[in-house]
């Protein structure tokens, strides 16, 4: 994939994530600065998601540590856990929010 395709794929996934957060009603504030999406929680904890263009990866940093996602078989998969990106973000959001989140 070239850089343009990479950015299109990541932007599409991040927009989906923002929409899911909005639809959930959870107290999570998404803040975008350049290639970084920070999810800010009421308890002041954060999840940081950024695009790593040179490696064509999405990186996620949370309470659980750092994770790298590569685009394989038309989905973003974690190199450490094998989890799909959105599923891992949902799991990490639950940990940071300290409450059950109703994902739509």
Curated annotation (Swiss-Prot):
Organism superkingdom: Bacteria
Pfam families xrefs = Frataxin_Cyay
* Entry-linked InterPro entries: CyaY, Frataxin/CyaY, Frataxin/CyaY_sf, Frataxin_CS
One GO cellular component assignment for this chain's record is: cytosol
Q: Which PROSITE patterns match?
A: FRATAXIN_1, FRATAXIN_2
Q: Which GO terms describe its molecular function?
A: ferric iron binding; ferrous iron binding
Q: What Gene3D superfamilies does UniProt report for this protein, alphabetically?
A: Frataxin/CyaY
Keyword Iron listed: yes
Kindly list the biological process annotations in GO that this record carries: iron-sulfur cluster assembly
Q: Which family does it belong to?
A: Belongs to the frataxin family.
- What is the role of the protein in this entry? Involved in iron-sulfur (Fe-S) cluster assembly. May act as a regulator of Fe-S biogenesis.
PANTHER family in alphabetical order: FRATAXIN, FRATAXIN, MITOCHONDRIAL
Q: Which HAMAP family match?
A: CyaY (MF_00142)
Its protein name is Iron-sulfur cluster assembly protein CyaY
Q: Which species is listed as the source?
A: Aliivibrio fischeri (strain MJ11) (Vibrio fischeri)
Q: Which gene encodes it?
A: cyaY
């Amino acid at each position: 994939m070239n850089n343009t395709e990479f950015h299109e794929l990541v932007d599409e996934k991040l927009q989906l994530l923002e929409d899911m957060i909005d639809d959930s009603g959870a107290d999570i504030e998404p803040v975008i600065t350049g290639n970084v999406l920070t999810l800010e929680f009421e308890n002041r904890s954060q999840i940081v998601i950024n695009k790593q263009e040179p490696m064509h990866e999405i990186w996620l940093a949370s309470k659980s540590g750092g994770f790298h996602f590569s685009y394989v078989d038309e989905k973003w998969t974690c190199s450490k856990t094998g989890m799909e990106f959105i599923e891992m973000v949902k799991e990490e959001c639950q940990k940071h929010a300290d409450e059950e989140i109703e994902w739509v």
